[in-house]
Amino acid sequence: MGEHPTIAIVTGIGTAQAHAATAQAATAQLLDTVKVEWVIVVGISGAIDNQTPIGTLVLPELVVSGADCSQYRPKPLRLGDAHGTLWTTDSLLVDPRVHADLRNRGVVSLDMETAAIAKVCEQRGVPWSVLRAVSDRASDGSVDAEILGLANPDGRANSPAAARYLLRHPGAWLRLVRLARGSKLASERAAEAAITAVS
């Protein structure tokens, strides 16, 4: 991008340690193979607050691993003021009490990969930043384990699984359309911000 040589890798999405390990392994392989000056984690996330608009850019001051509460501080980006905490978890968090507790801790958004990537970067002394855009809201019930299972590990839609899901739940097509639109908007917003960040 611009005058900066750029390498992009896809770590996919995750709901279990195996997927977090994949993000970790992909990052480690990249950093062990190529001299990298800076890693930017770009992707989508779920807002913890029902009032957060879809497409909102998330620039956290802190990333916390839900697995062991380890904390990572990203390098600030020139995209606006960083605020709040991004909580990385292998679990799909749907309990409103958990959401309230996380909000009280300053969590603004949830993802499934950033802490794993940050850990590798910090172990190797490579600066890193993160930007995410909100694709859905954790507290509105739009995503559950079955819905998350409609995506391939790389994040792309699994069309046969979606068709089977709609045969079982014919009234759910509006939910899927809303999620697809939210994911598309968030992905575009995150990509635009990433280009701006390195330009």
Give the residues covered by each predicted segment:
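Glycine-rich phosphate- or other oxyanion-binding loops that anchor nucleotides, phosphorylated ligands
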Residues: 1-199
